[in-house]
């Protein structure tokens, strides 16, 4: 199969298939929470930009479905006043200094930023996995696919040992804080997380296309 087209598969089925692809594509996988201890890259497979692009498109499709579902179920739509304020969330964003924009584009800097940003999103995806009340297949697919995308992009970073992982203590503290909020606020946070991840991936998609 040369495409990540999912028209014939459910989100869960695709996620399981993605795990099989990951198992064959990465014979010696490195856990996301561990830094690379060996700087050599000759034995790591190179992944074409097309695969990363298709995977990003797939994730964006799942996010779109989740946002639509929340809009219909909770009236948490894109133009809702609550979703215009990011409250106390410190969600990853893309800026000019990250080297991902066409002006001032820097492939290595951009790859590092996308990879680290997606790692930072993991704690928020855990939150979605715990509290999203819609189609759980979509939340699972987004989380698994995002981890797969991180692995794909790490193959292209020249110095993967410099890809820092978020502090687990900080992440745990943030997750505990989010969990103490009422359901209305949780729903607002979830739509903010989805919107921010979507924006981040849209910038990432444009950057991957010119790499």
From Swiss-Prot:
Q: Which UniProt keywords apply?
A: Acute phase, Cytokine, Disulfide bond, Growth factor, Phosphoprotein, Secreted, Signal
Q: From the Swiss-Prot or TrEMBL record, what is one GO molecular function term?
A: cytokine activity
Query: For this UniProt entry, what is the primary localization, expressed as one broad class?
Result: secreted
Q: Where is the signal peptide?
A: 1-29
Any idea which residues bear Phosphoserine here? 80
Q: Which Pfam families match?
A: IL6
Q: Where in the cell is it found?
A: Secreted
Disulfide bonding pattern of the chain: 71-77, 100-110
Q: Name one GO biological process term.
A: positive regulation of receptor signaling pathway via STAT
Q: Which InterPro entries match?
A: 4_helix_cytokine-like_core (IPR009079), IL-6-like (IPR003574), IL-6/GCSF/MGF (IPR030474), IL6/GCSF/MGF_CS (IPR030473)
One GO cellular component from the entry? extracellular space
Job of this protein: Cytokine with a wide variety of biological functions in immunity, tissue regeneration, and metabolism. Binds to IL6R, then the complex associates to the signaling subunit IL6ST/gp130 to trigger the intracellular IL6-signaling pathway. The interaction with the membrane-bound IL6R and IL6ST stimulates 'classic signaling', whereas the binding of IL6 and soluble IL6R to IL6ST stimulates 'trans-signaling'. Alternatively, 'cluster signaling' occurs when membrane-bound IL6:IL6R complexes on transmitter cells activate IL6ST receptors on neighboring receiver cells. IL6 is a potent inducer of the acute phase response. Rapid production of IL6 contributes to host defense during infection and tissue injury, but excessive IL6 synthesis is involved in disease pathology. In the innate immune response, is synthesized by myeloid cells, such as macrophages and dendritic cells, upon recognition of pathogens through toll-like receptors (TLRs) at the site of infection or tissue injury. In the adaptive immune response, is required for the differentiation of B cells into immunoglobulin-secreting cells.
The family this protein is said to belong to: Belongs to the IL-6 superfamily.
Subunit details: Component of a hexamer of two molecules each of IL6, IL6R and IL6ST; first binds to IL6R to associate with the signaling subunit IL6ST. Interacts with IL6R (via the N-terminal ectodomain); this interaction may be affected by IL6R-binding with SORL1, hence decreasing IL6 cis signaling. Interacts with SORL1 (via the N-terminal ectodomain); this interaction leads to IL6 internalization and lysosomal degradation. May form a trimeric complex with the soluble SORL1 ectodomain and soluble IL6R receptor; this interaction might stabilize circulating IL6, hence promoting IL6 trans signaling.
Record protein name field: Interleukin-6
Organism annotation: Camelus bactrianus
Q: Upper lineage ranks?
A: Eukaryota, Metazoa, Chordata, Craniata, Vertebrata
Gene behind this protein: IL6
């Amino acid at each position: 199969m040369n495409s990540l087209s999912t028209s014939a598969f459910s989100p869960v089925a695709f996620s399981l298939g993605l795990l099989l692809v990951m198992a064959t594509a990465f014979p010696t996988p490195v856990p996301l929470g561990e830094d690379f201890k060996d700087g050599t890259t000759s034995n790591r497979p190179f992944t074409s930009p097309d695969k990363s692009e298709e995977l990003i498109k797939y994730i964006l499709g799942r996010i779109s479905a989740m946002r639509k579902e929340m809009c219909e179920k909770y009236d948490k739509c894109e133009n809702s006043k609550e979703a215009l304020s990011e409250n106390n969330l410190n969600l990853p964003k893309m800026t000019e200094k990250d080297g991902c924009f066409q002006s001032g584009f820097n492939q290595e800097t951009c790859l590092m930023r996308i990879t680290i940003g997606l790692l930072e999103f993991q704690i928020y995806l855990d939150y979605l996995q715990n509290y999203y009340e819609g189609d759980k297949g979509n939340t699972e697919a987004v989380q698994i696919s995002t981890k797969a995308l991180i692995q794909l992009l790490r193959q292209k970073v020249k110095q993967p040992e410099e890809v820092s992982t978020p502090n687990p203590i900080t992440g745990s503290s943030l997750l505990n804080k989010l969990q103490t909020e009422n359901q209305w606020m949780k729903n607002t946070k979830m739509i903010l997380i989805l919107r921010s991840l979507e924006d981040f991936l849209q910038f990432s998609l444009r950057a991957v296309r010119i790499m």
